[in-house]
């Protein structure tokens, strides 16, 4: 079981307020601040909010993750709040086939093949909130579905062979951008020169 939380608070830019005086007020009878701040942002992530990895006695592995993210930026120049949020769920399943024989010429190798399948759904959206006008507007967003399948075979401690297939389907919430699909597949051979 795993959990991680990260939060960052940033002040984009600030300058000394030349009109500042102790106990001074502005025209709306608000206290005057020592600094003029233009932008404040908060970035928080639960990456993962909760995650669980399990290895079963029959060489089966399962895992699932729930991730959350939120970025909030307050612009004090134009009184706008920009909020970007994202939610993701990842489900994974793997299996290790032990001592699988592979014949190369007159030599037989008995190594393991690790097969991994991951499926994820991520939803992102960006909302602009105009505070003085009391208007909220969705300006960006998407739903991303991803499938990743791979099989790894280790010939020895230096040589590894990997077959993979990745597919990502991106469906936007707004009609300003087009749905896209990306597919990657292939074979990779990794040879390690150093130990």
Predicted regions and their residues:
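Exposed, low-structure sequence patches enriched in small/polar residues
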Residues: 2-195
């Amino acid at each position: 079981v795993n959990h991680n939380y990260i939060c960052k608070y940033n002040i984009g830019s600030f300058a000394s307020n030349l009109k500042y005086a102790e106990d001074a007020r502005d025209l709306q009878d608000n206290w005057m601040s020592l600094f003029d701040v233009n932008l404040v942002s908060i970035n928080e992530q639960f990456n993962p909010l909760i995650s669980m990895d399990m290895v079963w006695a029959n060489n089966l592995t399962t895992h699932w993750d729930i991730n959350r993210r939120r970025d909030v930026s307050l612009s004090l120049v134009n009184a706008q709040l920009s909020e970007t949020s994202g939610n993701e769920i990842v489900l994974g399943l793997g299996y290790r086939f032990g001592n699988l024989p592979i014949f190369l010429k007159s030599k037989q190798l008995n190594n393991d093949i690790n097969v991994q399948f991951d499926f994820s759904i991520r939803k992102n959206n960006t909302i602009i909130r105009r505070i003085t006008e009391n208007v909220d507007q969705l300006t960006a967003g998407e739903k991303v579905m991803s499938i990743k399948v791979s099989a790894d075979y280790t010939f020895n401690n230096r040589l590894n062979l990997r077959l993979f297939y990745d597919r990502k389907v991106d469906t936007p919430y707004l009609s300003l951008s087009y749905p896209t699909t990306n597919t990657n597949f292939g074979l990779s051979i990794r040879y390690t020169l150093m130990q």
